[in-house]
């Protein structure tokens, strides 16, 4: 007998699938950073995979959607800031801030304005990061690596936006 899709089940599926997408993206970044031999981003993305597994358990077992979503927004900001500082603006990690700003449609909070606050936080981070990182990076990347990061970030960001638009 198929399960009836009520609002609680719908929220559960949305957040579970978003978290699974984040696990897949960070696993991909873990592999990529390992192949490119970038130690700090490799370690960060391993920790991110573990973080998102924890968020998946938080959603599946405890149904703590608001806490999980809040922590995911903050993790995304940390991810983008760290990787942009390390690899520069042209690696396009900032695209994830734009993708996450589109998540205002999912509101596990009591107040409908909280997702908009997170979107504003993402946009502020975007502009501040742009202003602070122009011409500064901690590592110079070969052009092929920079292009690969740009393609991966574009793909991951568009995948996130398309998922949000689809559900």
PLM region spans:
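Cytosolic juxtamembrane amphipathic/interface segments immediately preceding
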Residues: 2-8
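Hydrophobic alpha-helical transmembrane segments of multi-pass membrane proteins
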Residues: 8-65
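A generic helix-loop boundary/linker signal
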Residues: 14, 93-94, 158
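Physicochemical signature of membrane-embedded alpha-helices that form the seven-helix bundle of GPCRs
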Residues: 18-21, 44-47, 71, 114-115, ...
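Hydrophobic transmembrane alpha-helices
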Residues: 26, 52, 57-59, 69-95, ...
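Juxtamembrane or sensor-core-proximal signal-transducing alpha helices
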Residues: 152-167
């Amino acid at each position: 007998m198929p399960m009836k899709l009520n609002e609680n089940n719908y929220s559960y599926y949305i957040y579970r699938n978003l978290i699974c997408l984040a696990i897949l993206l960070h696993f991909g970044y873990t592999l990529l950073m390992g192949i490119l031999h970038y130690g700090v981003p490799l370690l960060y993305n391993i920790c991110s995979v573990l973080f998102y597994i924890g968020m998946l358990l938080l959603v599946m077992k405890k149904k703590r959607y608001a806490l999980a979503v809040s922590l995911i927004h903050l993790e995304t900001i940390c991810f983008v800031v760290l990787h942009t500082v390390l690899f520069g603006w042209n690696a396009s990690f900032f695209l994830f801030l734009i993708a996450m700003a589109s998540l205002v449609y999912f509101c596990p909070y009591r107040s409908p304005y909280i997702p908009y606050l997170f979107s504003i936080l993402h946009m502020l981070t975007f502009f501040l990061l742009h202003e602070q990182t122009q011409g500064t990076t901690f590592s110079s990347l070969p052009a092929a690596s920079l292009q690969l990061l740009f393609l991966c970030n574009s793909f991951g960001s568009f995948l996130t936006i398309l998922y949000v638009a689809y559900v």
